[in-house]
């Protein structure tokens, strides 16, 4: 199975956790994301090096105007899409299996959590994961320590308080 097929499954909204092949591939990419975030978080890097490492995490290039202050954490990495002139401040955590879309000009404050997964409410099905995308629209500012849950789509030009 390839990443493309896994992303199609994740983006379809189908339950995750019932297909062993999907789970194993997701874990493989999670380990890759852990290695790359560890590289970002454990020593000083110039801004262009951070952008390069972040691009490797998400599997696509970010613009020259991208900014990230470490530490940064993601437990998958391959379902993040970043617009132009985006800034992510220190201590952010992205759980992106359900898809995280951050449009142009967005500012993400210190310690923000973007969580796209939920476990099933039925204890017998608790290992199943339900995902939904988060879409941060153009020029949105998310204040420090805010938690944005699965399925949230912001309006344009708003700020979300901490």
Predicted regions and their residues:
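Regulatory activation segment
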Residues: 124-129
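Hydrophobic alpha-helical segments, principally membrane-spanning helices and signal/leader peptides
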Residues: 2, 69, 89, 122-123
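Left-handed beta-helix
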Residues: 64, 69-70, 75-76, 83-84, ...
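Histidine-centered active-site/metal-ligand motif
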Residues: 119
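Terminal amphipathic alpha-helical/low-complexity segments used for targeting or macromolecular assembly
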Residues: 1-65
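Short, T/G/N/S-enriched strand-turn elements that build extracellular solenoid repeat scaffolds
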Residues: 56-57, 80-82
